[in-house]
Curated annotation (Swiss-Prot):
This is Variant surface antigen E. It comes from Mesomycoplasma hyorhinis. Residues 1-29 form the signal peptide. One of its GO terms (cellular component) is plasma membrane. Disulfide bonds: none annotated. The gene is vlpE. The lineage of its organism: Bacteria, Bacillati, Mycoplasmatota, Mycoplasmoidales, Metamycoplasmataceae.
């Protein structure tokens, strides 16, 4: 009986010693675990680099990468990317080409650097922004209504084909009449008598002669229809001369 009691006491004391010896080991292991956790949670400092590209429509695309070094010896790496937008030319309504000088120019094909309000649809008119010439620019007379060729001297000339530099109100449709702007001669110009009603030939001496075919240089009131009567202006001889 005494031996069994003694052996039980030895086992109990040995077990307590083992337990007491295990407590510091458990404490040490717990302390190491806590220390490792605290080291992994510490913030670190790092360096990074990035690059970006700018596109024509105003969007900015960038990307970057970096490496973070913590105090516990742990290395972390990562990458980041971002998008942004910017507007450089907002007010220019030019659809195809940019107009650096006049943002309100409505020219759809080519820029007009001098006159932003020019309504010329094909070519720019640098001198006269209000010119209504549809094909060619008229640098001298902005209100000229000549549709084919510019008339630099007479902006109100109504000559449809050729310009009349001297008489802006001449109604000559084919040729210009430089001397008599009111001449109604339809085919040829009458330089001396602007009121002559001779339809085919000019009558240089008698502006009121009503001779339809030939001119009557001496008697302006002769009513001879075919031949001229140089001596008797009031003779009514229709075929022969009355001397």
């Amino acid at each position: 009986m005494k031996k069994s009691i003694f052996s039980k006491k030895l086992l109990v004391s040995f077990g307590s010693l083992v337990t007491l010896a295990a407590i510091p080991l458990i404490a040490i292991s717990c302390g190491q675990t806590t220390d490792n956790l605290s080291q992994s949670q510490q913030p670190g400092s790092g360096t990074g680099s990035g690059s970006g590209t700018n596109t024509e429509n105003g969007s900015n695309n960038g990307s970057g990468s970096g490496t973070t070094n913590s105090s516990g010896g742990t290395n972390q790496s990562g990458s980041a990317s971002g998008n942004g937008s910017s507007n450089s030319s907002v007010s220019t309504p030019d659809g195809q080409h940019s107009n650096p000088s006049n943002p309100t120019t409505s020219d759809p094909k080519e820029s007009n650097p001098s006159n932003p309000t020019t309504s010329d649809p094909k070519e720019s008119n640098p001198s006269n922004p209000t010119t209504s010439d549809g094909q060619h620019s008229n640098p001298s007379n902005p209100t000229t209504s000549d549709p084919k060729e510019s008339n630099p001297s007479n902006p109100t000339t109504s000559d449809g084909q050729h310009s009349n530099p001297s008489n802006p109100t001449t109604s000559d449709g084919q040729h210009s009449n430089p001397s008599n702007p009111t001449t109604s001669d339809g085919q040829h110009s009458n330089p001396s008598n602007p009121t002559t009603s001779d339809g085919q030939h000019s009558n240089p001496s008698n502006p009121t002669t009503s001779d339809g075919q030939h001119s009557n240089p001496s008697n302006p009131t002769t009513s001879d229809g075919q031949h001229s009567n140089p001596s008797n202006p009031t003779t009514s001889d229709g075929q022969n001369q009355n001397k």
